[in-house]
């Protein structure tokens, strides 16, 4: 009899795998299911994407309880682990450790916390201040999260924003080492350069002290094999499903508005039957046959 591997264990194994692993952004239950069907072994619960699909800015305008509600639907809709983009932890150590417990309750496999101040500013904003948290305070926040988890395989990823904030390699390395020593299961090293030079410098200096996660949204032209050669553990494709859906909705809506007709869009969009399939409507039909009276 085979034993199903817990989602938390799956994520931990991915972070510590010798192979380069990939996880894909999702922002609701439907997109989570699509990501799984595509073959991805894990899901990134993007803060930007979850905020955007709620119609608010990526500045903690959506409360942590609203985000967790979305993540519950995503977890229910998929069998692969979800790593939540948990921003700064929605406050101090106490908010962050409470978040961890609530994520565990909902079957989320891990949380990624960034070392900036609450409320956060999206890392890809140009010309916006990116104040960093005190190193010791953030390291203790990581420790509080690790101490509060009940599942030993629940993963805490510490996201270092030193390069984003304009600091150099020494600061990035100092922060990464502090967070690793505090118990972080992996370090996410972020950069918004159009080339991977920040990541290259960090990986060389880091010297395989622990798993490293990257988000190549800005340096997307870099061949994936280069990340393998550097020793990166995991790549996050961070917001592309949300961006693709916005493009599709804009085009479809404009076409219908201009044409006052559905003729030119019907063959470009999925059928209602496909939506039913993604919702696993067949399971409900079978359940109705089994549990509803026949007359």
UniProtKB/Swiss-Prot annotation:
What EC number(s) are associated with this protein in UniProt?
5.4.2.9
Catalytically driven reaction(s): phosphoenolpyruvate + H(+) = 3-phosphonopyruvate
Task: Provide the residue positions that the database annotates as binding Mg(2+).
Answer: 58
Question: Part of which pathway?
Answer: Phosphorus metabolism; phosphonate biosynthesis
Q: What is the effect of changing residue 190 to A?
A: Strongly reduces enzyme activity
Q: Which molecular function term from Gene Ontology is one that the record holds?
A: metal ion binding
Q: Where is the signal peptide?
A: none
Q: What is the effect of changing residue 58 to N?
A: Strongly reduces enzyme activity
Q: Which SUPFAM superfamilies match?
A: Phosphoenolpyruvate/pyruvate domain
One matching Pfam family, short form? Answer: PEP_mutase
Tell me which domain of life the UniProt entry assigns to the organism this sequence originates from.
Eukaryota
Known role: Formation of a carbon-phosphorus bond by converting phosphoenolpyruvate (PEP) to phosphonopyruvate (P-Pyr).
Q: Which residues form the active site?
A: 58
Q: Which GO terms describe its biological process?
A: organic phosphonate biosynthetic process
Q: Which organism is it from?
A: Mytilus edulis (Blue mussel)
The name on file for this protein is Phosphoenolpyruvate phosphomutase
Which keywords accompany this UniProt record?
Isomerase, Magnesium, Metal-binding
Classification via InterPro entries:
ICL/PEPM, PEnolPyrv_PMutase_core, Pyrv/PenolPyrv_kinase-like_dom, Pyrv_kinase-like_dom_sf
């Amino acid at each position: 009899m085979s034993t199903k591997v817990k989602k938390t264990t799956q994520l931990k194994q991915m972070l510590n795998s010798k192979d380069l692993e990939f996880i894909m952004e999702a922002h609701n239950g439907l997109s989570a299911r699509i990501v799984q069907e595509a073959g991805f072994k894990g899901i990134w619960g993007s803060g930007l994407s979850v905020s955007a699909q709620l119609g608010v800015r990526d500045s903690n305008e959506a409360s942590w309880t609203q985000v967790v509600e979305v993540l519950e639907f995503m977890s229910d809709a998929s069998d692969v682990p979800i790593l939540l983009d948990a921003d700064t932890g929605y406050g101090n150590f106490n908010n962050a450790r409470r978040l961890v417990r609530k994520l565990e309750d909902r079957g989320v496999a891990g949380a990624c916390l960034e070392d900036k101040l609450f409320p956060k500013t999206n890392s890809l904003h140009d010309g916006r201040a990116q104040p960093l948290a005190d190193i010791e305070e953030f390291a203790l926040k990581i420790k509080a999260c690790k101490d509060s988890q009940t599942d030993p395989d629940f993963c805490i990823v510490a996201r270092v924003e030193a390069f984003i904030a304009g600091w150099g390699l020494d600061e990035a390395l100092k922060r990464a080492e502090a967070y690793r020593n505090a118990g972080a299961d992996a370090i996410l090293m972020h950069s918004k350069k159009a080339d991977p030079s920040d990541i290259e410098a960090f990986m060389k200096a880091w010297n395989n002290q622990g798993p490293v996660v990257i988000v190549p949204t800005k340096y997307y032209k870099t061949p994936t094999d280069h990340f393998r050669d550097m020793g990166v553990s995991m790549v996050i494709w961070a917001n592309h499903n949300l961006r693709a859906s916005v493009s599709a909705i804009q085009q479809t809506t404009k076409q219908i508005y201009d044409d006052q007709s559905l003729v030119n869009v019907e063959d470009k969009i999925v059928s209602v039957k496909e939506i039913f399939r993604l919702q696993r409507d067949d399971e409900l039909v079978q359940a109705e046959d089994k549990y509803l009276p026949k007359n």
